[in-house]
Amino acid sequence: MKTYLINLEESRRRRALMEEQLIRLQIDYVIVPAINGHRLGVAEISSLCNMDNVSKYPEWLSPGAIGAALSHRLALSCLVEDDERCGLILEDDVILPNNLASILEQLESLYVDDELILLYWSSDRMHPLRRETAVSIDNGHELAVSSEPASLLSAVGYIVGKSVARRIIALNTPVRVTSDLWASFLEGKAMKQIRCLAPSPLRLANLPSDIGYGRQHFLRRAKHWLEMKLPLIHRLSARRREAYFSRRQKYTWV
């Protein structure tokens, strides 16, 4: 299974982090050049996006989020063009497990058409997974169907097949939702089910967001600068991010 790593050209620190891991773990990967939404002009955004949605949800469809949606769309297009049965779409701020190659090999054999597999996911509630669908994977992880897939978020790492990739591209051209609004893609019948790997084998790296949901670009840059200049602030912020996302990955069996 090929991995499609999304990375902004200027994010050299992130690329170095990811390439060191992928090479060490012997993962077949290609780099997908991410699109920096903050560099898109008004005319470009108007031509690439559903402006009714951008106007209605400016906090979510921010320039950074629009760039992320375009970047994920490009990664999905690369998968389709490569004629891969399925592939891993991966963002560039992740700590990978040492057994990732084994996990991907198992998931490739278990992948079924018209589904999405989330290796990293987030939910605003205790997320229910269907016990009768669970399949054991390396190191105590289990792959199971979500009972409430519409509540799932995060596009940090997911496995997708060609048919689902094509439908997601079609549904989000022009960009009308963020790259991780799986509820919208489910409603549009891009996939029939979502399976989650629980607990998630991926961890977020302690790197500031390059997207900046719901923040002004200047404030995001200022916060980044402060965290880099003041190690204690950076450590505290990193711990808060880790604790926050850990709370959003709790699940229960039903």
Predicted feature residues:
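An acidic/histidine-cluster motif and surrounding catalytic segment
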Residues: 1-90, 94-254
